[in-house]
Amino acid sequence: MVRQYKIHTNLDGTDDKVLDVTNGKVRLYQPSNLGLQSTNNIWQSNGIGVMGKRSITQPQIEFKLETFGESLEENYQLMKDFVNDILSKKFVTLEYQTEIFQVYADLALADVTKTEGYGKNGTFSEKITFDIITKWYTYENLTFDKIENGKVIAGMSKVYGGTELGGYKYIEGTSYTYYGETNIERLSRWDIKDEIFSFMGILYPQLPKTPAGVRFLDDTGNEYTAIVFKTEQAQDYILINTDVNDEVYQGWNGTTSLNLFPVMDFERYRTRIIEKGQMELINLSKAEFKIKRKADFV
């Protein structure tokens, strides 16, 4: 598989426009630098050194840009539309895919050359340079459903160890439900194995006038941050995006949106960086997430 490049104008949004810059009529190739730069703070005396903090920076990426229109007029339009699509957004996202990985980088346009179209069809051959906002990260889609109590079935609930208990008897080969958890939400937890630096989520609240959201626990089970909203009316769903460059906390009832930032429980929202541990749903029937995990070098 030849490496593939695509540009997303709004990766987290429903209006995302995907530009295929590998196989489309505007193509990017020969990137100048997909790596990184590391600055090491080292103190030395008489050849003996002490290693301090390392700082990683991401250099600009420069691509060669080529248009493949059928005519001079089409090539002008391709060039114009491509640049305007990028300029119309605060930043865009580069998708970089090979046979062994698929990663993303958030970029801001820094420079693009503009010469004259050449050849029979008026093709443009230019250079385009991007400043790096965040590079690289993985992007995953996850869905979580709340665990609920089972329905009571006469003679077939709360079976323990295959023995009769309280009038209920275990029968081999029969399916049983379990019922009676007064704090069923404590079972709606999921392990987080790797750090998440930002995520976009759609949350589906259950009860009105009851805090709704998600909380995050460390390895010892202690809450270190939570995104929880206190609303009078239950929302159809809550849209959140913790990316510092594209932050959103928005409730939706039908086609009406509401800014939920003022009703967030700020005492519990301590950090946007999600660590290894667990996540728990609070007053939610379901949650859908698009999560981003950092990968400095690929």
Curated annotation (Swiss-Prot):
GO terms for biological process: symbiont genome ejection through host cell envelope, long flexible tail mechanism. The keyword RNA-binding does not apply. GO terms for cellular component: virus tail. It comes from the Viruses. It is found in: Virion. Keywords: Viral genome ejection through host cell envelope, Viral long flexible tail ejection system, Viral penetration into host cytoplasm, Viral tail protein, Virion, Virus entry into host cell. Homohexamer. Interacts with the receptor binding protein. Belongs to the skunalikevirus distal tail protein family. Forms the distal part of the tail. Self-associates as two rings organized back to back, with a central channel allowing DNA ejection. This is Distal tail protein. It comes from Lactococcus phage SK1.
